[in-house]
Amino acid sequence: MPFVKYRGANGEWIKLGGGNVRVSNGHTWIPPRARIWDGHNWIKCLEEKHVDEFVATNSGGYWWSDHGNVSHNHFNSLWAPNYPLQGNYRPYHDRFSNNGQHGMIYFNDQDIRNHLAGARIERVELFLYAVHSAYFNGGEAVIGTHNFRGGWSDVFQEVNHGVARARFYGRNTSQWIVLPNWVGDNLRDNLISGITTNGENASLWQYIVFAGTNQGWKAPKLRITYVK
């Protein structure tokens, strides 16, 4: 993408639009905007690409509908409440539930909106670390979104199911999962606030336990590439 530079006081060339120049709109100072004609289209020339990571602020696992979709703070889960998970707990581990489980991952959505305000989203990625799975060779992660406002919900919520799927190839493995760009748009536009893990059924293939925010560098995080 083309860009514009100007000569600084010491003879150095400074790129416009890099946070060092503002223009007045009569009321406030704002980043400059400019376009050039490439012979076919007008191209914005003062935009910059940014890649920001947002570490989750909280996370948790939830029971299925047979226990009211409540968090693992209730009853006796074999996994600590901070672990988001999905899929069937029975018969592999826990006879207490006949159905699958869910997970919710929370972010500082206001901070994300502050970064993305006015931005064009180019790529959205989610980092997950699979601590455990029913099978040694892994399984399938099913990713959704939620719009809970606050640091913690005691009941599982989801507004978009199955927005992305990813194959994990074993226990104690991690990956960046590409999400649709509209997930970033919805975060920017205050339509969603976080991520869910939620298998469709009681299949062991979708039984995966993910690291939560108490697991240090293994904690879930979002990486968003955008231009503004």
Please name every model-derived segment.
Residues 106-116, 177-183:
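Signal that preferentially marks extracellular ectodomain short beta-strand elements
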Residues 1-49, 223-227:
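Enriched but not universal
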Residues 195-212:
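Short beta-strand-plus-loop segments that form exposed binding edges in beta-rich domains
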Residues 131-134, 199-201, 228:
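Acidic glycine-/aspartate-rich tracts in secreted/extracellular proteins
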Residues 29, 35, 42-112, 201, ...:
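Flexible, small-residue-rich N-terminal segments that precede or flank a structured functional core
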Residues 107-110, 117-133, 222:
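A short beta-strand element within beta-rich, extracytoplasmic domains
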Residues 101-103, 120-122, 139, 173, ...:
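Residues that flank catalytic or metal-binding motifs in active/ligand-binding sites
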